[in-house]
Regions:
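Class I SAM-dependent transferase core
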Residues: 2-72, 108-123
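Residue-level signal for inorganic ion chemistry
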Residues: 36, 170, 210
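Conserved SAM/SAH cofactor-binding pocket of Class I
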Residues: 60-139
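Short SAM/SAH-binding signature in class I
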Residues: 140-147
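Short beta->alpha connector loops
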Residues: 147-151, 172-174
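A short, conserved alpha-helix within the catalytic core of class I
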Residues: 150-160
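Conserved beta-strand signature within the Rossmann-like core of class I S-adenosyl-L-methionine
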Residues: 163-176
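Active-site capping/gating segments
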Residues: 173-212
Length: 212
């Protein structure tokens, strides 16, 4: 199956711009991280071995689509497989005029995240504790998901839902292989990070945008 795949190299300037977004929202993001780490001692929302510094990098990673202008098409987004609220919570903090639904089928995680977003005052977000296959996805809602699904699994769960854009945080090689072996034609753009040798966190990573 031949797929329409556009490759886009993302330069270091994009990372620098994303870090500026982080800095503008640092107070609220740090409050979110405080609560995430507090809850993580009770429920495994993120790896217990992860440092706060690495979590901050995960937040920056979550904000990259904003710097690339990929969120502008929709005012409503659902973060599926959200876990502890990544990428949805940071995106909600940095985009107060947009609505974010944090979705995961693990109910105890969503109870924790619901408490986090309430205590953090992230008023433009809410949790949805069910499989994405059971969500009543409204037209005009984009989908984001960070290292939670393979392409075929997510599209199978979405079924006939009226999605238009999906943004997936993926390893570049893995994403290209998933696209190559998928048995239906996809319109995809793969954003490959080229941030330099001194940014090892981002090595081999990228964003896959699927549109229809």
């Amino acid at each position: 199956m031949k797929h329409q795949l556009e490759l886009v190299k993302v330069s270091r300037e994009t990372l620098e711009g994303t870090r500026e977004i982080y800095q503008k929202n640092e107070k609220d993001i740090e409050r979110y991280l405080d609560l995430l780490l507090e809850w993580n001692e009770k429920i495994n929302l993120v790896s217990r071995s992860v440092s706060r510094e690495t979590l901050r990098e995960h937040v920056v990673h979550s904000l990259i689509p904003m710097q690339l202008g990929l969120l502008e098409a929709f005012n409503s987004w659902i973060d599926s497989g959200s876990g502890g609220g990544l990428p949805g919570a940071p995106l909600a903090i940095a985009n107060p005029a947009k609505r974010f639904f944090l979705n995961d089928n693990v109910k105890k995680k969503m109870r924790a995240v619901d408490d986090i977003i309430q205590q953090a005052g992230i008023e433009n977000s809410e949790t949805v504790a069910k499989s994405i296959s059971l969500v009543d996805l409204q037209k005009g809602t984009g989908i984001v998901t960070k290292h939670a699904f393979k392409i075929d699994d997510l599209l199978r769960l979405l079924g006939s839902k009226p999605w238009k854009t999906i943004i997936m945080w993926k390893g570049v090689e893995g994403a290209a292989e998933e696209i190559r072996t998928f048995n239906k034609k996809l319109n995809t753009t793969l954003y490959e990070f080229h941030f330099g040798d001194d940014e090892p966190f981002y090595e081999g990573k990228g964003l896959l945008v699927i549109q229809r």
